[in-house]
């Protein structure tokens, strides 16, 4: 099974070697047919502590690193 890759914005960088990434998804509401935004936060591994709040990054699914961390940052798209 291929690894999932998501894109989001870094919203937390206080932890050592970890960033919190907010991933937003959009979908049409089944009844209202209106575009709805929902977001979810993922903890991702940042080996060199190089990503800061506001950076847009891609995260990739990986083996569990800790209790909450199952993603790793693979690239930055910019600010």
Curated annotation (Swiss-Prot):
Keywords: Ribonucleoprotein, Ribosomal protein, RNA-binding, rRNA-binding. Pfam families: Ribosomal_S17. The lineage of its organism: Bacteria, Pseudomonadati, Pseudomonadota, Alphaproteobacteria, Hyphomicrobiales. Part of the 30S ribosomal subunit. GO terms for molecular function: rRNA binding; structural constituent of ribosome. Belongs to the universal ribosomal protein uS17 family. The gene is rpsQ. GO terms for cellular component: cytosolic small ribosomal subunit. It comes from Rhizobium etli (strain CIAT 652). One of the primary rRNA binding proteins, it binds specifically to the 5'-end of 16S ribosomal RNA. The keyword ATP-binding does not apply. GO terms for biological process: translation. HAMAP family: Ribosomal_uS17_B. This is Small ribosomal subunit protein uS17.
């Amino acid at each position: 099974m291929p690894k999932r890759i998501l894109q989001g914005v870094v919203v937390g960088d206080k932890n050592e070697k970890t960033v919190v990434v907010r991933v937003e998804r959009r979908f049409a509401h089944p009844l209202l047919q209106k575009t709805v935004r929902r977001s979810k936060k993922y903890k991702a591994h940042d080996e060199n502590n190089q990503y800061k709040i506001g950076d847009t990054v891609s995260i990739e699914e990986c083996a569990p690193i800790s209790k909450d961390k199952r993603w790793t940052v693979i690239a930055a798209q910019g600010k």
